[in-house]
Every structure is written in C-alpha cells, then in structure tokens.
C-alpha cells in the first residue's frame, strides 16, 4: 500500500515529528508491501507561489492509497502551511468538482473518494476547553 504522510509542524523535535510520525513510520516499516513518502510543509518552505512544489504534492496525492495529516492546532486552527496545503493542493478540478443542482446551487463531488485519510492533531491546551468548544461547535451560533 502507498502511504503519504503530510507534516505541518515547524519543529523537528516536536511530538508531531518524533512521536506520531515516528510511530507511523515504524509501524509501516514493520509491515511488508508498505511504501511511505513524506511531505514536510515547513522543510519544503511551502508558499502559494511555488507551483512546481504544489504540482509535485498533487502527484503524491494521486500516487497514495492512504494519506496521514499530522499537525498541531494553534488558536483552534491548523498551521498556516497546512492551511496553504489544503487551499493550493485540494483545488476544484483536482480534488473535486461542483455539480449543479440549480443555476445558483451546487454540491462538491470528490475525485479522491478511494483514498483513506487519517488526521493526527495535537494541541497544548487543556482538554476540557478544547472538547467543550469542539463538541459544542454545532450549537454555537455567531
């Protein structure tokens, strides 16, 4: 199986790198027929104007059977590089298309449905406020 790991943490000594990614790599290396490729968004210095890098990322997404996202959550958001990755790689025409329902309404149809996705998100906040906010997000109306 082809595995793609996308890391969105700037610190090479972080738990995202040494804990989560290290464990995924060890497990996959211990099993036969497992290929692993890694995208380190901070090491690659991803910026919106890096078209060659973004095209390479799209090729890796197509290549993969499984995609692992590893990122801290800062101020209840993904890191800027991870957000840039989603904005620039998973674009209409590549990851999905809009299917019209009416002239003014459409829904997205995925081109990546067969991919298996796992997300590993870390945070430094106490768990109670995080769980309270995330579990009640659908109840909060701003």
What residue spans do the PLM features occupy?
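Alpha-helical scaffolding within the catalytic cores
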Residues: 102-106
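An alpha-beta-alpha
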Residues: 120, 124-135
């Amino acid at each position: 199986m082809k595995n793609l790991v996308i890391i969105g943490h700037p610190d090479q000594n972080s738990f995202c790198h040494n804990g989560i990614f290290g464990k995924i790599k060890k497990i996959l290396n211990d099993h036969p027929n497992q290929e692993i490729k890694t995208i380190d968004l901070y090491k690659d210095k991803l910026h919106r104007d890096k078209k060659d890098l973004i095209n390479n990322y799209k090729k890796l997404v197509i290549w993969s059977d499984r995609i692992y996202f590893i990122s801290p959550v800062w101020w209840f958001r993904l890191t800027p590089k991870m957000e840039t990755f989603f904005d620039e790689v998973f674009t209409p025409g590549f990851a999905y298309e809009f299917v019209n329902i009416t002239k003014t309404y459409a829904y997205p149809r995925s081109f990546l449905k067969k991919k298996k996705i796992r997300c590993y998100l870390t945070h430094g906040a106490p768990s109670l406020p995080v769980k309270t906010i995330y579990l009640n997000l659908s109840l909060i109306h701003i």
